[in-house]
Amino acid sequence: MNNKYFFQNDDLGPFQPSSADIMLRQQLETSLSKFFYENCDRKIRDLLSVCRWYVTTHTSAMTLVIECPDQVTNWRILQKMVPMASLLNNIASSAKIRVCPPSSQGMPFEMRVDELSVYREDSA
């Protein structure tokens, strides 16, 4: 009897991106970051300039990560979540924002741009 084995995609090992895949992802993230920053208003740009921030596409959704240097900046960034989410929603409807307070000063806050209507009602 001749047995043949058929593998499902789930049975295969994890996908290892090639160096070209990694480079293309980095270029995409750089372009998305530049587009986002250039379309922010001056107040948001000023806030971002004192933070470490970047765009990542490693998960199923594009994520804007903002690491705040202090609690005051963290609070100001949180107050600008709605306009930043609106801008990201124009780029990708599955995007999210993660705001990270300084180390050991709280947990990151994460918002999906598809939740925008909830936050708009609260900020009105």
Task: Give residue spans per PLM region.
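N-terminal presequence-like segments and adjacent domain-start helices
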Residues: M1-I44, V50-H58, N89, P102-E110, ...
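Short, non-transmembrane amphipathic alpha-helical segments
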Residues: V72-K96
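Structural motif
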Residues: P69-D70, P102
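Short, aliphatic-rich beta-strand segments
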Residues: M62-C68
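Helix-rich interaction surfaces within compact, conserved domain-sized segments
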Residues: K96, M107-A124
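Residues at beta-strand starts and edge strands
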Residues: S60-M62, S93
